[in-house]
């Protein structure tokens, strides 16, 4: 796009050759009249991730791997006032960026948000109820329980962003100092980041962090 991007989509990767193409195609095919850019922050993959990603996005090779470091490293190289962080196995629908941008334009007090998550790669499970046969995935209850978890976190005024999709205003991201560098393999980057945002909003006496139940993304259930 010729005009300066208003949205920067940032995807950290490390050996994601089996997932990255689908995710980037989903971002590339957005029906969005807002200028946006696609940035891949690669942590020195040893597979074909970078080769694939360069067909769809601007790729930066970071000096070391680690999701927090990779994301923080590329943010200064982006232009958008709205930062969209996606995992390499997360899929968005074709109107995702348009809808997200409108939400932030309408709600000036919104600091950051995540869309609801649905896990897409579970195995089908069939069961019979009376004469009817029903089929669900083995992630059905995981999807439901995760939805309840984030709903009640928000209800109790301790909202938690979802790591596979975090959308935040650039200025707010910079105010909290980006993602905290946690020890390797320690789960909880998104919770620590959410807590930093909650602290900032209370200190500033303004700002909201939300999970959007009316917008969803698909992501892998791998852990």
Describe each region flagged by the PLM.
Residues 25-35:
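Short, acidic, metal-binding catalytic loop of nucleotide-sugar glycosyltransferases
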Residues 161, 165-168, 172-176, 184-206:
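A short, conserved alpha-helix in the catalytic core of glycosyltransferases
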Residues 36, 50-77:
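Conserved donor nucleotide-binding strand/loop of the catalytic core
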Residues 83:
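Short aromatic/hydrophobic "clamp" motif used to bind/position activated sugar donors
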Residues 1-26:
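N-proximal low-complexity "stem/linker" segments adjacent to membrane-targeting elements
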Residues 95-128:
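Conserved donor NDP-sugar-binding/catalytic core segment of glycosyltransferases
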Residues 115-121, 130-159:
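Short, flexible, basic/aromatic active-site loop/helix in glycosyltransferases
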Residues 26, 42-50, 90:
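A conserved acidic beta->alpha catalytic loop
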